[in-house]
Amino acid sequence: KEGYLVNSYTGCKFECFKLGDNDYCKRECKQQYGKGSGGYCYAFGCWCTHLYEQAVVWPLPNKTCN
């Protein structure tokens, strides 16, 4: 599974500005989803890879980013 890293309180994606390989996204994805995951910056949001099937990613139901 893959998807955008999301803040569970706000419903917002984690923003990033250095597209492609991005240490911030890699670190945040690993912290949120575990060591096996990876991440990079895609369309100014952290995109996480190698997630477990039940991982919660953006968009969250009934939560809009404010």
Curated annotation (Swiss-Prot):
GO cellular component entries: extracellular region
Alphabetical keyword list: Amidation, Disulfide bond, Neurotoxin, Secreted, Toxin
MF terms in GO: sodium channel inhibitor activity; toxin activity
Asparagine amide: modified positions: N66
Localization: Secreted
Top-rank taxon: Eukaryota
Tissue specificity note: Expressed by the venom gland.
Pfam family, one: Toxin_3
Classification via CDD domains: neurotoxins_LC_scorpion
Chief localisation class: secreted
Cross-referenced InterPro entries: LCN-type_CS_alpha_beta_dom, Scorpion_toxin-like, Scorpion_toxin-like_sf, Scorpion_toxinL, Scorpion_toxinL/defensin
Residue pairs linked by disulfide bridges in the UniProt entry: C12-C65, C16-C41, C25-C46, C29-C48
Domain LCN-type CS-alpha/beta: 1-66
GO BP of this protein: defense response
Domain comment (free text): Has the structural arrangement of an alpha-helix connected to antiparallel beta-sheets by disulfide bonds (CS-alpha/beta).
Family as reported in the entry's similarity comment: Belongs to the long (4 C-C) scorpion toxin superfamily. Sodium channel inhibitor family. Beta subfamily.
Function recorded in the entry: Beta toxins bind voltage-independently at site-4 of sodium channels (Nav) and shift the voltage of activation toward more negative potentials thereby affecting sodium channel activation and promoting spontaneous and repetitive firing. This toxin compete with high affinity with 125I-Css4 bound on rat brain synaptosome and may bind with high affinity to Nav1.1/SCN1A, Nav1.2/SCN2A and Nav1.6/SCN8A.
Name recorded for this polypeptide: Toxin Css8
